[in-house]
């Protein structure tokens, strides 16, 4: 029997559950698979299967994450759930499991708690585009006024971190009721209502191939009689033979024209997101281009040296530093394909950063790098990863 071809007829979207410990993230994840399985859009995955999340390595950091997939009538979803708070922090900062949107789970019995706040802040810092809220454990709250208060608190918290708190859908329900079939309205119906809102409210992500062209430079060769070939994996967009592109980062931006695209020694008329290609550049000398620069659509990305970042610093056990660092710390920042030295400025009131901390900090690089918000990087000391980060905003 031939293996069934995976046909993706529906648009794909990556989401995840976030929120305070024990507010019901994993139960909700299980409940979604159970309810959608009845409609044939998922395989039911029980709580304990999701809870024993396998460990993965992302940028040298060990993270436990569980992945489930399911579909609604409109979309195919990959859903990520993490067992521990530290795993969420690492996951969101490294972008190990990318999120196009998040389901914030808040227990109606407790209201927003410290990690609720921290996950919303992280979602803002790492650029999660949209959040839908599931007010869980509503079967434990008899007073409708109390529910309204919790809802108001959640909306205020979201607004505080620049999410549209007054517009975000909040669905009241109970993941346990859905799993135990005890209360149709708070259980199954609430989960279906949640997924309807996730479908409608979380915007469909733009596919990498539809975004402006960008390719990090991995290697540069000179081919006699042909010119200079730059190799790398196209990160996004499409590049066609004959198109004008820019070389951005490290040195002043240069314009050039792509006169050929090669893949596996064959000449193509274009290269697109995901392809490993060699691009032949007109009139560009071998010494004009270096690893760490990017080829991109003119005007789409600018070089920057100063930015604000959210970073996670590895523990000693993860192979990180054994000691704290202070402001003016000078490690290397590994962006895409190269290390650049930078100086760290800690926020006022933060004396030092301990291994295992996550921190908002300002970085000044010694040379400019092609960057934009949401770009991930590693923090390294002599080739050893000591942290991971994401560009939260650009200063200059």
From Swiss-Prot:
One of its GO terms (molecular function) is guanosine tetraphosphate binding. It catalyses: GTP + H2O = GDP + phosphate + H(+). Mg(2+) binds at residue 26. GTP binds at residues 19-26, 81-85, 136-139. Residues 81-84 are annotated as: G3. This is Elongation factor Tu. Residues 60-64 are annotated as: G2. Residues 10-206 form the tr-type G domain. Monomer. Residues 174-176 are annotated as: G5. GTP hydrolase that promotes the GTP-dependent binding of aminoacyl-tRNA to the A-site of ribosomes during protein biosynthesis. InterPro entries: EF-Tu_GTP-bd, EF-Tu_GTPase, EFTu-like_2, EFTU_2, G_TR_CS, P-loop_NTPase, Small_GTP-bd, T_Tr_GTP-bd_dom. Disulfide bonds: none annotated. The gene is tuf. The lineage of its organism: Bacteria, Pseudomonadati, Pseudomonadota, Alphaproteobacteria, Hyphomicrobiales. Belongs to the TRAFAC class translation factor GTPase superfamily. Classic translation factor GTPase family. EF-Tu/EF-1A subfamily. GO terms for cellular component: cytosol. It is an enzyme of class 3 (hydrolase). NCBIfam families: EF-Tu, PRK00049.1, PRK12735.1, PRK12736.1, small_GTP. It is found in: Cytoplasm.
């Amino acid at each position: 029997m031939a293996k069934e071809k995976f046909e993706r007829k529906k648009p794909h979207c990556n989401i995840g559950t976030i929120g305070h410990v024990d507010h019901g993230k994993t139960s909700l994840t299980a409940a979604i698979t159970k309810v959608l399985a009845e409609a044939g859009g998922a395989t039911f995955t029980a709580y304990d299967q999701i809870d024993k999340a396998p460990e993965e390595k992302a940028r040298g950091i060990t993270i436990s994450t569980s992945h489930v997939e399911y579909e609604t009538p409109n979309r195919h979803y990959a859903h990520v759930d993490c067992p521990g708070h530290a795993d969420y922090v690492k996951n969101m900062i490294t972008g190990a499991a990318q999120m196009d949107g998040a389901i914030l789970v808040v227990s109606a019995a407790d209201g927003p708690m410290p990690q609720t706040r921290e996950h919303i802040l992280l979602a803002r810092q790492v650029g999660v585009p949209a959040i839908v809220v599931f007010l869980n454990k509503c079967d434990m709250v008899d007073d409708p006024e109390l529910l309204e208060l919790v809802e108001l608190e959640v909306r205020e918290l979201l607004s505080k971190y620049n999410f549209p708190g007054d517009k975000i859908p909040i669905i009241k329900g109970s993941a346990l009721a859905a799993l135990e079939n005890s209360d149709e309205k708070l259980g199954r119906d609430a989960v279906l209502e949640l997924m309807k809102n996730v479908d409608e409210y979380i915007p469909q992500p733009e596919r990498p191939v539809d975004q402006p062209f960008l390719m990090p430079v991995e290697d540069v060769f000179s081919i006699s009689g042909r010119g200079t070939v730059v190799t790398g994996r196209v990160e996004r967009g499409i590049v066609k033979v004959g198109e004008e592109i820019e070389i951005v980062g490290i040195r002043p931006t240069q314009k050039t024209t792509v006169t050929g695209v090669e893949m596996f020694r064959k000449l193509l008329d274009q290269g697109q997101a995901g392809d490993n290609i060699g691009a032949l550049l007109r009139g560009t000398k071998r010494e004009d281009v270096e690893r760490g620069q990017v080829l991109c659509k003119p005007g789409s990305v600018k070089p920057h040296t100063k930015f604000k970042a959210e970073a996670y610093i590895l523990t000693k056990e993860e192979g990180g530093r054994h000691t704290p660092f202070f402001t003016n710390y000078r490690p290397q920042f590994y962006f895409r394909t190269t290390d650049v030295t930078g100086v760290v400025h800690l926020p006022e009131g933060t004396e030092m950063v301990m291994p295992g901390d996550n921190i908002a900090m300002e970085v000044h690089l010694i040379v400019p790098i092609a960057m934009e918000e949401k770009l991930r990087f590693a923090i390294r000391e002599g080739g050893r990863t000591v942290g991971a980060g994401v560009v939260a905003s650009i200063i200059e």
